[in-house]
Amino acid sequence: NTTLAREQVWGDDRHCERCGTPVIKKDLDQWFFCTTKYADELLDYSALDWPERVRTLQVNWIGRSEGASVVFSTEQGEEIEIFTTRPDTLWGATFMVLAPEHPLVERITSAAQRQEVEAYKQQAARQSDIQREAADKEKTGVFTGGYAFNPVNGKRIPVWIADYVMVTYGTGAIMAVPAHDERDFVFA
């Protein structure tokens, strides 16, 4: 197992610049710092004499968001936590989407959907985050066979995986509200 930086991955077929081997994403032990949890402290520049341009870069990098964490329960008794800047749209959530790498995917995928989910996860692992997040990329995904319950109205809603949801962003899970979000509308 080797870790490569983005600039070491070349071509549309995503191969290693050194040996030409196809590059795939793998789950490896690594460290992440959740800067958003410390956003208020990190954004306190009162003691720093930084140029405004640098302060703006820091604000954008830290990514402070106002909103609410909401927990959806699954039929299997698991909990899917999402973060939303629009808690008022909870009533309109009609499905959920997990990142293909989300740890709950294994536990909520039905036996009937397992093969299709595994194939999709492998396909997503061959794409870079930049490719997955591209605005012009077709939104694709597969149904896990699992369901969650909307916490405000109790409705049973399907849980999908899709490569436009990133495990490294937020909780790696979203509630989908097609009436209020263009990506959710396109995916639906």
Task: Give residue ranges: language-model regions.
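Catalytic alpha/beta core of large soluble enzyme barrels
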Residues: H102-F187
